């Protein structure tokens, strides 16, 4: 039986972080957590991290698609915050962002990890951006590091 598992140290990886400016007071903490994890735990040089700001979470997939198509990066981390309001807008933005990012990831065989919060209120967002519930940006970075290694191992098997 063959088993593929991986660690999180990927010194030579290039990663793109796409971050929404909307709800930036939350997203900046997610970004900080992601960069800290990539550099401190993943041992990635800051010069190998491209950070792109977009207006909102809805705009993340088009930039992710462009980056994935360049074939220059090993992973993409999506960072945004969608807080439920009084309309269905929340659901549409979240569903479109997640489904489009998933489609892009499988189309281009590039890990795209989700540091996108979908919360009921601002308090939940604050809790998930570095306080009581951890930092989802950091968790997305950890997932990206592991997935980079897994994808490298899969490519070796098939070559």
Swiss-Prot record:
GO cellular component terms?
cytosol; riboflavin synthase complex
> Which residues are responsible for catalysis?
89 (proton donor)
The pathway it acts in is:
Cofactor biosynthesis; riboflavin biosynthesis; riboflavin from 2-hydroxy-3-oxobutyl phosphate and 5-amino-6-(D-ribitylamino)uracil: step 1/2
Q: Name one GO biological process term.
A: riboflavin biosynthetic process
- Cysteine pairs bridged by disulfides in the record: none
Record's keyword terms, sorted: Riboflavin biosynthesis, Transferase
- Report the superkingdom from the record: Bacteria
Alphabetical list of SUPFAM superfamilies matching this protein: Lumazine synthase
Q: What Enzyme Commission number does this protein have? A: 2.5.1.78
Q: Which GO terms describe its molecular function?
A: 6,7-dimethyl-8-ribityllumazine synthase activity
What enzyme category does the UniProt record give?
A: transferase
Role: Catalyzes the formation of 6,7-dimethyl-8-ribityllumazine by condensation of 5-amino-6-(D-ribitylamino)uracil with 3,4-dihydroxy-2-butanone 4-phosphate. This is the penultimate step in the biosynthesis of riboflavin.
NCBIfam families recorded for this chain?
A: lumazine-synth (TIGR00114), PRK00061.1-4 (NF000812)
Query: What is its quaternary makeup?
Result: Forms an icosahedral capsid composed of 60 subunits, arranged as a dodecamer of pentamers.
* Record family assignment: Belongs to the DMRL synthase family.
Protein name in the entry: 6,7-dimethyl-8-ribityllumazine synthase
Could you tell me which species this protein originates from?
Buchnera aphidicola subsp. Schizaphis graminum (strain Sg)
């Amino acid at each position: 039986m063959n088993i593929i598992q991986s660690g999180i140290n990927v010194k030579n990886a290039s990663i793109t972080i796409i971050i929404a400016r909307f709800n930036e007071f939350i997203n900046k903490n997610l970004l900080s957590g992601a960069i800290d994890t990539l550099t401190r735990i993943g041992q990635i040089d800051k010069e190998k991290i491209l950070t792109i700001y977009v207006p909102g979470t809805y705009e993340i997939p088009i930039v992710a698609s462009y980056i994935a198509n360049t074939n220059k990066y090993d992973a993409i981390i999506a960072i945004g915050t969608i807080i439920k309001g009084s309309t269905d807008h929340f659901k549409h933005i979240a569903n479109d962002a997640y489904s489009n990012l998933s489609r892009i990831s499988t189309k281009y065989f590039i890990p795209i990890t989700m540091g996108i919060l979908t919360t009921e209120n601002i308090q939940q967002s604050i809790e998930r951006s570095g306080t009581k519930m951890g930092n989802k940006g950091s968790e997305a970075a950890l997932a990206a590091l592991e997935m980079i290694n897994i994808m490298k191992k899969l490519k070796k098997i098939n070559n």
